[in-house]
């Protein structure tokens, strides 16, 4: 037997030791206290890991060890000016190498001192900032876990976002653990909502779109029910909606007849090219809605069908029945949360469907456990990899070899074009999609002799039009 002691691989423990032994540890702690006071004074809202940790502290739990240095991520309705102001305060208090720079995430400004990041300020439009639910922890406002759920679902919806550290590698495990903690300590109560339904028939393309919204819920529910019958499990008693559907298809189109809530009769589809699909289907565009933060993309509305644009992203999808394409359950959960936030009058309806979708996943998990016991490991792996109820990297295809082009990538490309003074070829997919970088926030370094940038306009840059506002279409 070896006489060597068993090694201690407690990463959190050694991270705390490393932080305390840093040469500038005292200065960093002092800077973070200035940031904390600034957050309280300006009534900004913490989000991300720090907000989850503080919310869990209120329930006697946590995700970070006691004493770990806080990583302050905050929402602000005026994040550029707030970031500049925080930099000025730090500089005036004698901190060195203070600066504010635009982050990779275009709606975020980062503040640093002595080359250590001490604050991330992200833009949230006033109409959302003033209405989102919050909690209070030690005088700090933190985003409510109900809202935080949306960001956790988001990573599962776009597995190839944020290359070269794609979410499927860098976020899936961490976000799933955090989601389970939120669900444990902050479950959304199940409040039944009675809805009246009407049968609606739609004809849609076979390959270019993924069925979304209430229709996707109906398809997933019936797929679950068929799996239950296959597993010979008795019918469940449930108060959740049990809509039905039928369909037939040809080589190009699907004709779908489905029970839709009378309050929301429009079919919702996700597609990489909404305007092209609308034109191909011969529909009339009536309204366009800007994104709602990161949680809902641009929406192109016609009278009977609403198209969620996934342009520049690769959306995770499920395949059910006879190769019907449906959004993943995670994107459906995100849709119902978005509906609860964006339409307060129907919040209870959307949260009821959110819980209903969680119930579907819970029951699907129990059925998968039955199948796993009845099949070989190889057979179960093949079955699970095609199940619409598990996390997936199967994505909705686009017309290019590459589909994921983040705002950061497009800004970088626009910078290259500006510096080289060589425009992209007209045949390049992004030739008409590069942002105007002259309208982006400028970096700011107090004490370097340059005046503080002024008059940043949120309205002049489409990347900051993320309040969910809808306007009639001119088409």
From Swiss-Prot:
Transmembrane segments: none
UniProt GO BP: mRNA processing
Catalytic activity: RNA(n) + ATP = RNA(n)-3'-adenine ribonucleotide + diphosphate
Keyword hit for Repeat: no
Superkingdom assignment: Viruses
EC number(s) given by UniProt: 2.7.7.19
A GO cellular-component term linked to this record: virion component
Localization, UniProt: Virion
Family affiliation: Belongs to the poxviridae poly(A) polymerase catalytic subunit family. Highly divergent.
Protein name: Putative poly(A) polymerase catalytic subunit
Organism (species): African swine fever virus (isolate Warthog/Namibia/Wart80/1980) (ASFV)
């Amino acid at each position: 037997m070896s006489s060597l002691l068993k090694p201690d691989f407690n990463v959190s423990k050694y991270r705390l030791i490393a932080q305390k032994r840093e040469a500038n540890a005292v200065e960093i702690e002092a800077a973070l206290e200035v940031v904390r006071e600034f957050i309280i004074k300006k009534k900004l809202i913490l989000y991300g890991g720090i907000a989850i940790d503080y919310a869990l502290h209120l329930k006697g739990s946590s995700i970070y060890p006691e004493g770990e240095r806080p990583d302050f991520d905050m929402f602000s309705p005026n994040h550029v000016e707030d970031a500049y102001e925080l930099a000025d305060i730090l500089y005036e208090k004698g901190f060195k190498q203070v600066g504010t720079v635009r982050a990779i995430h275009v709606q975020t400004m980062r503040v640093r001192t002595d080359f250590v990041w001490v604050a991330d300020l992200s833009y949230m439009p006033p109409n959302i900032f003033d209405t989102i639910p919050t909690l209070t922890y030690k005088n700090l406002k933190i985003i409510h876990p109900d809202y935080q759920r949306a960001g956790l679902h988001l990573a599962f919806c776009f597995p190839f976002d944020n290359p070269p550290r794609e979410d499927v590698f860098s976020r899936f495990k961490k976000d799933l653990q955090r989601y389970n903690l939120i669900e444990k300590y902050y479950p959304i109560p199940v409040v039944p909502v009675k809805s009246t339904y009407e049968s609606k028939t739609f004809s849609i393309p076979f390959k270019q779109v993924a069925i979304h919204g209430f229709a996707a819920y109906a398809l997933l529910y019936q797929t679950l029910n068929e799996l239950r019958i296959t597993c010979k499990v008795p019918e469940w008693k449930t108060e959740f909606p049990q809509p039905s559907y039928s369909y037939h298809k040809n080589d190009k189109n699907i004709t779908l007849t489905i029970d839709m809530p009378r309050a929301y009769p429009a079919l919702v589809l996700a597609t990489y090219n909404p305007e092209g699909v609308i034109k191909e289907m011969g529909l009339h565009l009536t309204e366009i809605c800007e994104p709602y933060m990161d949680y809902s993309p641009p929406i192109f509305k016609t009278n009977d069908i609403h198209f969620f644009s996934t342009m520049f992203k690769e959306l995770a999808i499920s395949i059910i029945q006879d190769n019907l394409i449906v959004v993943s359950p995670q994107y459906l959960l995100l849709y119902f949360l978005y509906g609860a936030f964006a339409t307060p009058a129907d919040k209870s309806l959307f949260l009821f469907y959110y819980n209903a979708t969680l119930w579907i996943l819970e029951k699907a998990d129990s059925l998968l456990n039955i199948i796993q016991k009845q099949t070989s490991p190889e057979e179960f792996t093949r079955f699970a990899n095609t199940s619409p109820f598990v996390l997936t990297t199967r994505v909705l295809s686009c017309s290019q070899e590459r589909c994921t082009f983040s705002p950061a990538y497009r800004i970088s490309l626009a910078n290259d074009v500006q510096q080289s003074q060589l425009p992209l070829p007209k045949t390049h997919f992004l030739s008409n999609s590069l942002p105007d970088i002259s309208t982006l926030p400028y970096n700011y370094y107090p004490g370097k002799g340059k005046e503080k940038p002024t008059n940043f306009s949120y309205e002049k840059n489409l990347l900051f039009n993320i309040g969910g506002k809808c306007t009639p279409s001119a088409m």
